[in-house]
Amino acid sequence: LYLDDAVDIVEEMPASVVIRILDKATPELRKSINEILKYPEDSAGSIMTVEYLSLKKDMTVSDAFKRIRRIGGELETINILYVTDPTRHLLGVLSVRDLLLAEEDDLIEDIMDPNVIWARTLDDKEDVAQALSKYDFLAMPIVDMEQRLVGIVTVDDAMDVIEEETTEDFEKMAAMLPSDKPYLKTGVFETWKARTPWLMILMLSATFTGIILTHFEDALMSCAILTSFVP
């Protein structure tokens, strides 16, 4: 279970259960979960994972492969690698493909791309998801206010955000209260409960419109064009 998925599960649990889980967790895991939970729900920080693979610019390609073999199996993705300095400032990005095509004694700084597209922890998560889709990225690096790398948003989490926002827009168009579940996974009763408030509002507005129209019936009959302005 990857960290971002663990955070999603923790967010759905009662506070008493969360406390017990965090008590049982290792100090490192507890720190990572708390780090993500502190971000606003609609921010990039709330959907990022802190499990990424970073390299130093003075490493060789051979050193990079050794690091990937050592810790890569514990991470959510190793397709994209990030180059940082000793204080975690983001310097560049490269892919495993770049490593495979390079010589073993090539330096990372010579093959990395220094032009990194990144997002901040407090950026809107929908904007980050749209950027991932626009640039066809597998992951987006997330930095803090001092441009230190703190995590990444992976493409699967971005797709979850896009699905969530699309569902919410669809429900608004259908006169439904936004739901946490995708439309096709929502039960009949939940759908009915979500639509009822909006249907009541529409019914009341239609009733008031009807009452008003009865007072101006003669005017409408004499000038039919006025019906075009009826809401």
Predicted segments, located by residue:
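Cytosolic regulatory modules rich in charged/polar residues
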Residues: 1-231
